[in-house]
Amino acid sequence: MLEKFSSKFNVLKHSTTNGLLSVQINPNDIYEAVLFVRDNIGFEILADIVCVDNLYIDKEKRFSLYYIFRKISSENLCIYIDIDINQSVKSVESIYKSANWGERECFDQFGVKFENHPNLKRILNHKDFQGYPLRKDYPITKYQVLYESDDLVGEMKNEMQRAGLASEENDEFKTKYTFLNIGPSHPATHGTIRNFVALDGEKIISCVTEIGYLHRGFEKACENHSYAQIIPYTDRLNYCSAMLNNVGYAKAVEEALGLNLPDRGIFMRVILGELARIIDHEVCLGAMFVDMGGLTNYWYLYNPRERIYNFLSKLTGARFTNSFARIGGMANDFYDGWKEELLAHLKDVEKGVDDTMILIEKNRIFLDRVQNICKINANDALSYGFSGPNLRASGVSFDLRKDKPYYYYDSFDFSVPVGSEGDIYDRMFVRFFEMRESISIIRQAIKLIPEGKISVDDKDVFLPSKDQVYSNIESLINHFKLIFDGIKLPNGHFYSASEGANGELGFFIFSNSEPNPYRVKLRPPCFYALNAFSSMVQGSLIADSILNLGSLNIIAGELDR
């Protein structure tokens, strides 16, 4: 791949870390390089765009932009460029639709400008925000209050002009159509998301999405905390499957350190991660049934979920935000009798799934609401950066557990459910079938889980036990040293991805070998799924858009960070 790329472009630097080939090129070549990567090398997905402020790094240019690409055959590629503080970059939105919001985020947080971008405006921070918060010289304690919200009329006019529904010369569209805000504080949005729609009757003609209402500055906080201190923050990303966030982040740090976990710790992560996936899907589907008036279905899914929460509470001490993973292992081992309890809970989940599917499979009212509604085809889904159940619903069989296996997933017997139409029906039923597969994986893992340690025996990574600290001076010193000095990664950038409940959960880490990460960038699957929402709902009814939003399973904590 490097040889093919080098034959076309001047490669300034290249390196390979943990299987990720990274290539530095001239900034002027970025558009042609991205086009070449898609059309000649075959990378279907632009997974993320990451900006790093080099203010305290020994680099000549102020910013570096990293473009992370993925093939559904599991290969990754990173192309990066260095640019000056006032240097603009060609937009690649016309090549990959996922670049639209990815570039907007770089502009919002760092001030990087992209030429020919169709809507270069802030996305996570509000319209009156001054400065660029992820620049190194922006103080973390500085906050800015928004006193008047954006009416979004100007953005709506631009969207309608591009669609030929409005004219630049006049504002006739304001009287021709009805305008409605769906959110940001509405029970049907399942989170703080605002969709401003233009209506012809009940049909949506155009839609503008505004996010950022739950933006807490997760990535800025990461730069000001040690690697271990970040774990509780990950719980608050996709809070419906907190354990998967813990595991995804810990996995990224461990891969950068070259750590190999004990088998029992790995199996614990598989079991608890699949439980989190089940909970997440139950929340998604149960909430959708409430939206369409199916309360019986809701309780069939929510009651077993409650029992799993009780299990997690007993194990971790917390129902919702568990903070149970550790860099190098797990916080504690399973308690006595956990297998019997968990197997009983899995039977409850299985029965709830079966009973729900019996109620809806031939229900004409249900089928009319979800079949052939808000469809997205495979090519568009890939271009928008879809992953997980939403991508598989469009007919693309891609699952990181299968295609780039980790944690012994290649030794488990499970299938990857795939849809065909990319409609609401497929997005729902892919999740139903995935719950069955997760149950199967957990049962297999319960049979196979070995005895032994749950964490690495490495004083530079994992804290000694309390018994050791209280009885051994060397352990006390190791504890003291790790707390004060922290975990230190090698210099460089690292990207790690795991299969979250909503798709590819990626963590990009830039390290300068200090106790705190120099830069952490989260790749939230929700972010790129919602980017496509506006195009998906055009021509549909208001009621359809509510179900479509639910079927994408947008979690505001992960979306806004």
UniProtKB/Swiss-Prot annotation:
It comes from the Bacteria. One of its GO terms (molecular function) is NAD binding. HAMAP family: NDH1_NuoCD_2, NDH1_NuoD. It comes from Campylobacter fetus subsp. fetus (strain 82-40). Keywords: Cell inner membrane, Cell membrane, Membrane, Multifunctional enzyme, NAD, Quinone, Translocase, Transport, Ubiquinone. It is an enzyme of class 7 (translocase). Its main location: membrane. It is a peripheral membrane protein. The gene is nuoC. Gene3D superfamilies: Cytochrome-c3 Hydrogenase, chain B, NADH:ubiquinone oxidoreductase, 30kDa subunit. Residues 1-152 are annotated as: NADH dehydrogenase I subunit C. NDH-1 is composed of 13 different subunits. Subunits NuoB, CD, E, F, and G constitute the peripheral sector of the complex. This is NADH-quinone oxidoreductase subunit C/D.
